[in-house]
Structure formats: C-alpha cells, structure tokens
Regions:
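Structural signal for interior beta-strand "rungs" in well-ordered beta-sheet cores
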Residues: 39, 99-310
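Terminal amphipathic alpha-helical/low-complexity segments used for targeting or macromolecular assembly
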Residues: 1-103, 164, 169, 175-176, ...
C-alpha cells in the first residue's frame, strides 16, 4: 500500500501531517478524495488549498500552508515534476505486450530480440533493424531499410516510410506519418509543375515523442532531423529538411516550412506558422497563432503576433489597438468641428 511516507522518501521531501495515510489515486487540486494525492505548482490555484478534498498535496518548499489538519503536505523543490514521478512510478496504466502476432507480415528476416512486440496486421519491410523492447502496434507500417532503437513504441496506424532512422526511447502516436515526400515542385514556363524527387530521409534522435496525426516529411536531399528530446503535440506539419533542436517542444497545429532550423530548448505555441529557410535561436518562445516571416537571431526571447513582435511590444500594441474605436470617434469629432 502506497503511503505518504513512501512518497516523501521517493521525492526526498519534507512531510507535514499523517505519514501513514494511504494513497490509492491521483486528482486535481480542485477536486479529489481523502485517498488521493494532488499537487500545487501554479500560484493561481493556491486558493484550492483551503477547499481541496485530496488527502495528500505536494507543494513547493517555501509554500505557506493553510491551517488544515486533514491534509498531509509534502514539500518538494518542484511539485509538478515530483507529481510526474509519482504518476509514472505508481499510477501509469500502460503495460506494453510482448510477442509476434501470427497475423503480422514481415518481408525478409528480422532478429527476434528481447521484448519485441509486432501486433496484428503490422507490416515490416526489408532490411529493418529493430532494437530491444521495440513495440509495434497493430496496423503500423515500417518501410524498407528503417532502423528503430531500443524501447521505442509505435502505436497503431503509424506509417514510417523507407530509410527512416529512429533512436532509443521514442514514442510515436497513432496516425502519424514519417518520411512521406516533401512538398517540392518546379514551376514550368507553361504554368505546370514538375515533381522534385525527394531522396533524403528522416532522423529522430533518442527520447523524441510525436503526437497523433503528425506529418514529418523526408528531406529532398540529406535529412529532416528531430534532435534528442524533441516533443511534438498532435497535428503538426514538419516539412522537408527541417531541423528541430534538442528539447524543443511544439504545440498542436503548428506548421514548419521547408529548411527551417529551430534551435535547442525552444517553446512553440499552437498554430504557429514558419516561413521557409529561416533560423530560430536557442531558447526562443513563441506564442500561439504567431506568424514567423524571418529569422530570430537573439536567443532566449519571447515573441507573439502575426507577423511576430517582441512580447512586451505586442502587449503595448494591443492596448493601442483596443483604443482605436475611441480614437476614431475623437478624430471624426475634431474633423466635424473644424
């Protein structure tokens, strides 16, 4: 039975309250039951410390606690990360299968390595290399000459075209397509287009996670590359020859045009659009629905808008924009009174 004392030991936290309270579930800070554990990381939810029904709450080391004796508090440096650790260790429902279904189809030979799972109606191409504990769920397709590293999970309906290289500890969610042709056509004098052959590939380094229904195009030449630790939300388009730097995270419906180079540790909001052939500096943060028409060269800055502006300038511009109807009325009155 999981107790508050065990959680405090796992997290090296300071326990305040009943060390023997049992924990059977997790909950949000504004809900819960006496046998549930929750956390407070964002100050805007601090009010719920007075009303939460959770029996155990993770808080920051400097958190001022309410005078409640019915809650056990555990003080930790980072409640959000600590909660993730507890979720993963004690409450993660994912249990991947093992074995090779008789209904999967393998073209050629593959090594039957430890922990391998090939689900029903999955298709494995020729000369495919699969690492230890790879999980390929039903109806996934792996093209010829692909490499998939250890502990990588490929969920149902994923399509991975030939020559793709995927590292260790990656997760690719259902409906994603990796390695399809980049959008390359040469305009002719008569207005028609000739397709440019896309002869490159896609490389996903270690610890990459791709959400559902993303599309990552192969390079025209060379490689489209997602560096170590990249995390993509659902419904994201990554065009040919894009490079996404280490530990960059991108929210849903973003579109990254061809040959864009995103730096390390960038944070990209939902529905952001990038023009092609630009470079984005390390640590850049871009707000949702922004349009990026040119390179960002200064690292660690925040941007928003379409076209983008520095965050503080954008806020000032919004204040002026909201005043435009009033200013228009005043100008019209001045014109009338000339």
């Amino acid at each position: 039975m999981l107790t508050a004392q065990r959680v405090a030991q796992d997290l090296d936290g300071e326990l305040i309250g009943d060390s023997e309270i049992h924990i059977n579930s997790v909950c949000k800070i504004d809900a819960g039951t006496k046998d549930a554990i929750s956390f407070l990381a964002n100050p805007k939810y601090e009010q719920f410390l007075e009303t939460t029904e959770a029996g155990v709450v993770l808080v920051k080391t400097d958190q001022v606690l309410p005078s409640r004796k019915d809650i056990t508090f555990i003080k930790v440096k980072d409640p959000y990360t600590s909660f993730c650790i507890i979720l993963g260790k004690y409450f993660n429902p994912v249990s991947h299968p093992k074995g090779i279904s008789e209904k999967c189809h393998v073209n050629g030979n593959i090594d039957i390595i430890e922990g391998l799972y090939l689900g029903e109606f999955s298709v494995i191409g020729k000369n495919v290399s699969l690492g230890r504990n790879v999980k390929i769920y039903p109806q996934a397709f792996i093209g010829d000459n692909c490499t998939i590293g250890e502990n990588t999970v490929i969920y149902s309906g994923v399509k991975i075209y030939s020559e793709t290289k995927i590292g260790n500890n990656c997760t690719i969610h259902s409906g994603t397509v990796i390695g399809s042709d980049g959008f390359g056509f040469a305009l002719q004098n008569d207005g028609t287009y000739i397709k440019i052959p896309q002869v490159g590939n896609v490389i996903l380094e270690d610890d990459v996670e791709i959400g559902a229904n993303c599309t990552i195009d192969r390079a025209t030449m060379g490689s489209t590359i997602l560096r170590r630790g990249v995390k993509l939300d659902n419904l994201i388009q990554v065009a040919h020859n894009v490079e996404i730097g280490k530990n960059t995270v991108i929210a849903a419906q973003a579109g990254i045009s061809g040959s864009v180079k995103l730096g390390d540790n960038c944070v990209i909001g939902g529905q952001v659009g990038f023009v092609g052939h630009i470079t984005i500096a390390d640590g850049t943060q871009i707000g949702a629905q922004s349009g990026i028409p040119k390179s960002i060269t200064e690292p660690g800055k925040q941007w928003i808008g379409s076209p983008i502006m520095p965050l503080k300038e954008a806020f000032k511009a919004q204040v002026i924009y909201r005043k435009l109807p009033e200013l228009d009325t005043r100008v019209n009155n001045l014109e009338k009174n000339k």
